[in-house]
Each structure stands twice: as C-alpha cells, then as structure tokens.
C-alpha cells in the first residue's frame, strides 16, 4: 500500500488504509485538517438528501492488502448490530486490484450446512473444507451481504466499499496469536446467530459494479464526465494510473491511491 498506492502510515504491517471514513476508529480528514465527519455535521447538505435517512454517514471505503490470509469472519445485519453493538451492520463489496498467481478468497459455503455441523467444524478446525474457495483475478468483483462468511486470502489486494461499520465476528484465525502471544479472540456465538449457512447468491447489478441501499459502485476508465446532484455526494478512488480532476473551476492532479470527496450538488467534474 505504501509503494503502489502512496499510503502514509506508521503501521507495520500495513494491511488496511481507510480512505473515506466518518467512523471514529479511522476518520478521514480534509486537506485543511478538518475531520470529514465534523465537516458533514456542519454541512449535512454536502452529503446529499439520500443520506438523511441514515443516522450516520452510510459508507466506508478502504484498501486491503492481504499479505497473509485474513481471519474467516462474518458481519451482522443492521438489526442485530444496532441492538447488540450500537452501530450499523455491514454489507460490503470487493474489487480485486491485484493478486498473486493462484490466489483465492473464501466466499460463503459451497453447499448448505446445518448449524450442528457448522459448530462441529469450528470446534475441530475443519471449517475451510466446506467453504466456497474462489480463484480470483484482477478486476473481479464480489458483493458480500451481511451474514455471509468470507475471508480475503494471502496475496490479494482489494478496494472495499462497505457500510460505515467496524463490527466483525471472527470464527477461525488459523491458530495465530496476537502481539501479546495469545490467540486472538473469536466470536463464535455471535457469528452463529447472524451467519447464512447457504451458498452465496449470484448478483447482476448491470450497468453498475455493485448497488444496494448504502452505495452504488461504478468503474470508469480514461476520460469521465459526471455530476453530483443534490441527492448524493460522489467518492472517487483512483486505482490505476494518473490524470487530472476538474471540479468547480479547480483542477488537481490525481494519481493511483488518491481519494476524492465530491460534495452533493457540485458542478460537473471531469
């Protein structure tokens, strides 16, 4: 992330970069040092009228670089998360930016499984035998509704667009230990309560890459002209190359790894 996407961070290893966030665990800042969340609290019209139906800013965007496989995990629905965690649940999508040869990820189950078998496989560390292991290539997209068991595996880099939430229930972590030398906490009880035990559904969001109540994602290449009307902001994430962004008479340079927040009702951008 540092070398290819220009991420500046003291974290080591650097596995994630939150590039559009109003979440307190990793807030985004404007160039003048103002937190994006504070700016939107003072200027709610900048987020757009569609955001008024949400108690909190609805979206969080990040880069993820899985140098090692991420824990097998699940995210709860809004209903469960608001009741038990006091924040939103998490529906998300992944867009594969790069991957090593032979890379794959886990995406739900390869067949329907009973709760009893699932509990047994978690206990005896055979969970991966029934997961849907999907080979990946650059440009692949995966839509992951809340309740879907999933994991990004070693050698995959993705852009993730998700609900504004940081609730994760881990069910398997490959026996790894944390910095304190102890196994990282699992959340099996909660995971069993929210998990879908069936194969993932197929989704076709054409002409969009992904679309749900919380976000719409498109991929554009080369020149692009668009507008942000009063209904919603536009977030631009540069995943390849470099160029120029013009909006409101101002032109700025844009390069791989940059993230731009275009306020609702902004003038055309190029």
Residue spans for each PLM region:
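His/acidic/aromatic-lined binding-pocket segments of jelly-roll/cupin-type domains
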Residues: 61-62, 70, 92-95, 133-134, ...
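Short beta-strand segments in beta-sandwich/barrel cores
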Residues: 225-226, 241-246
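Short acidic-glycine-tyrosine-enriched beta hairpin
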Residues: 131-143, 247-265
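Transition-metal
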Residues: 1-113, 168, 173-198, 217
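An exposed, glycine/acidic-rich loop-and-rim segment of catalytic or binding clefts
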Residues: 122-130, 141-143, 149-200
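Short, basic/aromatic beta-hairpin or loop at an interaction surface
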Residues: 111-124, 230-240
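Ligand-binding loop in jelly-roll beta-barrel domains
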Residues: 56, 64-69, 78, 88-89, ...
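Functionally critical, mid-to-C-terminal surface segments that flank or help form catalytic/ligand
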Residues: 183-233
């Amino acid at each position: 992330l540092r070398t290819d996407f220009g991420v500046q961070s003291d974290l080591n290893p650097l596995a994630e970069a939150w590039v559009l966030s109003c979440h307190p665990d990793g807030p985004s800042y404007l160039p003048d040092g103002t937190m994006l969340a504070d700016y939107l609290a003072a200027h709610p019209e900048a987020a757009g009228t569609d955001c008024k139906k949400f108690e909190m800013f609805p979206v969080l965007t990040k880069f993820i670089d899985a140098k090692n496989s991420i824990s097998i995990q699940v995210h709860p629905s809004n209903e469960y998360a608001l009741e038990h965690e006091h924040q939103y649940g998490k529906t998300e999508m992944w867009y594969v930016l790069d991957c090593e040869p032979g890379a794959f990820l886990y995406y739900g189950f390869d067949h329907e499984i009973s709760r009893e078998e699932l509990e047994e496989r978690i206990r005896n560390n055979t969970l991966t035998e029934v997961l849907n292991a999907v080979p990946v290539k650059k440009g692949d997209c995966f839509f992951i509704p809340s309740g879907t068991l999933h994991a990004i595996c070693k050698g995959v880099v993705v852009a993730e667009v998700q609900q504004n939430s940081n609730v994760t229930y881990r069910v398997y972590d490959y026996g790894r230990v944390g910095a304190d030398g102890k196994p990282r906490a699992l959340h099996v009880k909660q995971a069993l309560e929210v998990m879908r035990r069936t194969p993932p559904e197929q989704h076709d969001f054409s002409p969009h890459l992904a679309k749900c109540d919380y976000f719409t994602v498109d991929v554009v290449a080369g020149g692009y002209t668009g507008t942000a009307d009063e209904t919603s902001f536009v977030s631009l994430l540069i995943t390849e190359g470099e160029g120029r962004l013009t909006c409101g008479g101002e032109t700025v340079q844009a390069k791989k790894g940059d993230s731009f927040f275009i306020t609702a009702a902004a003038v055309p951008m190029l």
